[in-house]
Amino acid sequence: MTIEERAETASYYCQECGAAVTQAFADQIPVEAETLKKLGAGYAAGMGCMEATCGALIGAVMTAGILTDGKGTPAVSRQLVAGFQEKCGATICKDLKGIETGRVLCSCPECVRNAVLTLGEV
């Protein structure tokens, strides 16, 4: 599956942002798919309050930790944050959703898609 196909599939099934991103890479992670879904579940809506980092970005960082086997992960995380910020316009859930401005920068499915694409680029 190409990274674009992973991104489209993840964004289509975006019920919980963090879980959707981890699921997109389930075939590359030595953990049961259901466990991955549970690990990412708490990160929806900026950790449930929209005040924190987007769950999709958190899912990408968690996935990067597994894919890099923990080697060089902080550098990869920096690249993920920068790439996600560039694609989406923000990294905080309420900013992405325009809670205070009334202007949505990036929808949840697009955040998931962009997180998957960014992870595929780094």
Predicted regions and their residues:
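Buried hydrophobic packing segments
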Residues: V21-F25, L57-T68, A115-L119
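Polybasic, low-complexity association/targeting segments
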Residues: M1-S11
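Glycine/serine-rich anion-binding loops at beta->alpha junctions
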Residues: Y43-T63
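C-terminal binding/interaction regions
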Residues: R78-V122
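Catalytic phosphate/nucleotide-handling subdomain of diverse soluble enzymes
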Residues: G55-A56, A60, I66-T68, G72, ...
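Phosphate-handling active-site elements
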Residues: D27-L39, G65-Q79
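Generic structural signal for well-ordered, non-membrane alpha-helical segments
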Residues: A10, C14-G18, L36, G70-T73, ...
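Acidic-glycine-rich active-site phosphate/pyrophosphate-binding loop
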Residues: V21-A41, Q85-C93
